[in-house]
Amino acid sequence: MASPAPLVASISHQMVALQTLQLLQQEWGWGDGPSAPGSPRGPDHVPIAQARRPGQLRTRRGLGRGSIGARGSPEAGGLRGAEGGAELLPFPRDRGPCTLARMAMRSALARVVDSTSELVSVEQTLLGPLQQERPFPVHLKDSVEFRNICSHLALQIEGQQFDRDLNAAHQCLKTIVKKLIQSLANLPSDAHVVACASLRQILQNLPDV
């Protein structure tokens, strides 16, 4: 029986990334809370931080290898969103008028959040049992990179760097899904076919940008 450890670790990193993005949505007034469609479902779901105050997200130092440019140290009293995730620092919720660019940014962020939620759900409910029955490759480093990109994204307010980080998160998430599909493609069982179909549906919701 194959060890589920790489898949479990990948899910853990993805959930930290998801919690960071959900907190970012909520602090900007863009999220509907843990029960929103973007929230992972199932008994293994780790809810986002319950106590929070309006603020900007900043990553902690020491996110681990692959952290891309996390700047600054957490200030006293920051709220940890998740272990290795981001901290919440005071920042006003009023971010100005809702321009077309901001609407597009909100839509792109929501797409990444929803797709990450669906990926975690598929991994927990479908891929976990399959990994125990028959081994398939899991590329853990991609999930670590995704987590670090999302943590760096949370440092940004708006502008070109935010857009670049959001696009990087989008592309990294697509890479994770594509590699899982490739890993499952040559496995013959009906369960693997169902899992591949679910992953392809996620991929369809992540068009090229």
Curated annotation (Swiss-Prot):
It comes from the Eukaryota. Residues 28-87 are annotated as: Disordered. Coiled coil: none annotated. Pfam families: DLEU7. This is Leukemia-associated protein 7 homolog. It comes from Mus musculus.
